[in-house]
Regions:
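Central regulatory/effector-binding core of bacterial HTH transcription factors
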Residues: 1-31, 107-108
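A local structural motif
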Residues: 1-2, 96-105
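Short hydrophobic/charged patches on amphipathic alpha-helices used for structural packing
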Residues: 11, 15, 35, 70, ...
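Alpha-to-beta junction loops
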Residues: 14-24, 43, 100, 118-124, ...
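Flexible hinge/capping segments at coil-to-helix
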Residues: 30-78
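Beta-alpha-beta core module
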Residues: 30-37, 41, 112-161
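Extended ligand-binding regions for polar small-molecule ligands
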Residues: 55-62, 151-182
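Secondary-structure junction motif
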Residues: 61-70, 74-98, 164-169, 181
Length: 182
């Protein structure tokens, strides 16, 4: 059985023994789950191209932001992820490290809808680089962020007890394919 679910729910299914494996953005909240990282991606700040925020950050050319740059945005309306999403946790952590709590203009349940709202000028928000790579949105400038908190890792999680042969094979393949270091 394959279940498509957000990370927190996937972790819950794994802990309850309802699934053998869970693809989850780290961190796992349970210390009993073993995991293999699959890939890492950056988290970008998405900003409407023709906004005052874009000008405040130096124009419509993508560049790397420092924590001090994020601090300039503390009064701006953010489009945030709903609580319980790993991107919610990442967004909050990035803003806290810049010394503020973001002001929510809207809440979103998906990276794609958050990105679309930014493209329609409804606010600014954080998106994973995979969204930037697949989005066809000329109205958004994506800024990378120079922070260890601006990286997220997808991992396959599992409980070692009673792991099926198919699940063991998947974990073995994940270990072999893992090119993440450090």
């Amino acid at each position: 059985q394959v279940v498509d679910a957000f990370s927190n729910y996937s972790e819950e299914l794994l802990m309850n023994g309802e699934v053998d494996l869970a693809l989850v953005m780290l961190p796992f909240h349970s210390g009993t789950i073993r995991y293999e990282p699959l890939y890492r991606e950056q988290i970008y700040l998405a900003v409407p191209k023709h906004s005052d925020v874009c000008q405040k950050l130096g124009g419509s050319e993508s560049r790397e932001l420092e924590t001090e740059d994020l601090r300039k945005l503390q009064e701006e309306p953010f489009i945030l992820y709903e609580r319980g999403r790993r991107m919610y946790e990442s967004s909050q952590k990035l803003c806290r490290s810049a010394g503020f709590v973001p002001k929510a203009a809207f809440l979103s349940n998906s990276c794609e809808s958050l990105n679309a709202m930014v493209g329609n000028g409804m606010g600014i928000g954080f998106v994973p680089s995979s969204v930037e790579k697949t989005a066809n949105h000329e109205e958004i400038v994506y800024y990378s962020i120079n922070s260890p908190d601006a990286i997220r890792t997808l991992a396959v999680g599992y409980l070692e007890k009673n792991l099926s042969a198919a699940a063991q094979g998947f974990v073995k393949m994940a270990k072999k394919q893992n090119r993440i270091t450090g």
